[in-house]
Amino acid sequence: MVTVVENIDPKIKPVPAVIKELEEKYAGKFVVQHTVDEIPTVWVARADLLDVLLFLRKLPKPYVMLFDLSAIDERLRQHRQGLPESDFTVFYHLMSLERNSDVRIKVALSEEDLNVPSATQIWPNANWYEREVWDMFGIVFTGHPHLTRILLPKYWEGHPLRKEYHARATEFTPYFLNTAKQQYEQENLRFVPEEWGMKRSGRDEDFMFLNIGPNHPSAHGAFRLVLQLDGEEVVDCIPDIGYHHRGAEKMAERQTWHSFIPYTDRIDYLGGVMNELPYIMSVEKLAGITIPPRAETIRVMMSEFFRITNNLLFVGTFIQDAGGMTPVFYMFTDRQKAYDVIEAVTGYRMHPAWFRIGGTAHDLPRGWQRLVREFLDWMPKRLDEYVKAALQNSVLKGRTQGVAQYNTKQALAWGVTGAGLRATGLDFDLRKARPYMGYENYDFEVPVGYNGDAYDRCMVKVEEMRQSLRIIRQCMDNMPQGPYKADHPLAVPPPKDRTLNDIETLINHFISVSWGPVMPAGECTTIVEATKGLNSYYITSDKATMSYRTRIRTPTFAHLQQMPSVINGSLVSDAIMYLASIDVVMADCDR
C-alpha cells in the first residue's frame, strides 16, 4: 500500500477498516489518497477494478450501494502531486449503511486508451452512470449492455466535460436551424424498439409502443417515457431523459466559487437553499472555514422550510394524479404562507441564492419570530385535514397501496435514497446517521413505511413535514446570538467595514468580490438529506478562483433509472402513480 497525502495532515488518525480489509486482500496493489472530506479513497489498476468492486460488494458488512460514478479530466490539473499519472480518472463512490461509511475507488486512464470494464453486473444502477460518463467524457465501458448518449441527443458531437470542449456559447460557431436540420433532429427522436432489444410482437400479439411525454402532465417535467404495451400491461419501458439538461457541471468550471451559488438553486428548483447547502459546505471544508452557531441554525431553519414547500407540492400533485383535484389548491395556500416567511428572511422566494461561503447573505430581519410562529401554528392542523379528507380516502388507497412496490434490497441496489428508501422500512436519514449543521442537537423522528409502495412513499413525505415543523420550532426557540458569517479571509463576500481601515484590507476585499477567492487545492464531497433524497457535491479544487471539477449527484437521476424494474408487468395507471410517488423534478435529474 502506498499513501499519498493531499492538502491535509492526516495526523495519526486510525486507518479506516475498509483500507485494512483491502490491504489484506490486495497488498501493494493500490494507492491510498487522503482527501479533505476524509472519505477513504483508493486508486486501483484497471485490471483489478471489477475484482475490488466485487470484493467490497461482498464484504461481511457490504458496500451495497453504488452512490455515484463519474469521471474527471485530469489533463490540465496542476496540483496533483504524488497521485498516479492519469489523463482521465473514473471514480466510484460506494456506500455501506451497516458501517455507515463510504469508500471512493479511482481508476487512472490514459488518453490513448479510454476503456474501463462495466460494473453493471455488480450494481444495476451503474448503467445510467456509465452512459453519462460516455456521454460527457467519451470513456468506453466494455461490457455495457447499451452504451449510448443519455443526457444529450444521439446526434450531438463531442463530449462536453472534456477540458478542450468550449464552455461558452460565444466560443462556438453561430447556431442555426433550417428545415432540413429540424427534420433530421426530429427523426432522431423516433423510437426504434430493436435498438433496445425489444420485439415488436409476441407469440400471439403485436405490442403497442406508446410515448408519454416529453410534454405530458403526468411526466412532471420535460421527460419522455416509452412504454411497450400488451393491452394495458406494461411489458417493458424506456425512460428517456436529458430534455432539461443545461450543463450545470460545465458551468461550475467557468464561475467563481461565489458566483456559482445561484446555479445550485436551479438543480432541484423546488429545493431552494437546500440545493446550496452541500455545495457551500464542500467549499467551506476546502477553505477550512468553521461557521458560527447562529449561521448553522439559520441554515437548518430555512432548509426545513424548503423541505415543507417541496413536500406540499409533492403531496398535492400525488393526490391530483390519482384523480383528486382539490387538495393541491389548498396546499398552494400553505406554500404561499411558507414563502411569505422565506421572502421576508431571504428577499426571494423559490431561488434565493442566500447561503454564502462562511454563513448567510445577511442576518434574520426584525420580527422574523412572529412570522415563523404564525406558520407553525397554521400548518399542523392543515396536515391533519389533508390526511383525513384525502389520504385516508378509499379510492386513493386503492390506486396506490400495493402499487409500484419494491423492497429495501432492491432500493439499495438501484441507489434509492430519501423517502423512497425509508418507505421500505429502513430508517436511514443522513441528518440522524451522519449529522451535519448541528442536526444532532435537534429532537425529531425519522418517519418510515413498511410496504415500499406508492402510498407509503407519500405518507412518509407527510410525516417528514411534521418533523420539519418540530425542527423549525426548535430553531426559533433556541436561535443563538452572535455573527451570521464566519470571520475568515476566504468567507465571501468579506466584511465591508474593514475596507475603511487600511489599504491591505481594501485590496483583499476588491480581489475577493471581483476575481473571487482562491481556494486551497484538494477534493471534497458533502452529502445532505435533500428534499428528494441524498444530494452531493464532489468538488475538485486546483488552487484557483473557480472549481476544476464539480460533480453533482442528484436523487432523481437514480430514482428514474429504477422505473422499469418496478413497473414492468404492471398497468399503465400504475406507471403514472409510480412517477407521482418518487417526487420527480427533471432539472434535478438532468442538471
Swiss-Prot record:
Q: Which GO terms describe its cellular component?
A: NADH dehydrogenase complex; plasma membrane
Q: Which GO terms describe its molecular function?
A: NAD binding; NADH dehydrogenase (ubiquinone) activity; NADH:ubiquinone reductase (non-electrogenic) activity; quinone binding
Class of enzymatic activity (EC top level): translocase
Which UniProt keywords are given for this protein, alphabetically ordered? Answer: Cell inner membrane, Cell membrane, Membrane, Multifunctional enzyme, NAD, Quinone, Translocase, Transport, Ubiquinone
The segments labelled NADH dehydrogenase I subunit C in the record are: 1-182
- Annotated family: In the N-terminal section; belongs to the complex I 30 kDa subunit family. In the C-terminal section; belongs to the complex I 49 kDa subunit family.
Known function: NDH-1 shuttles electrons from NADH, via FMN and iron-sulfur (Fe-S) centers, to quinones in the respiratory chain. The immediate electron acceptor for the enzyme in this species is believed to be ubiquinone. Couples the redox reaction to proton translocation (for every two electrons transferred, four hydrogen ions are translocated across the cytoplasmic membrane), and thus conserves the redox energy in a proton gradient.
The name this protein goes by in its record? NADH-quinone oxidoreductase subunit C/D
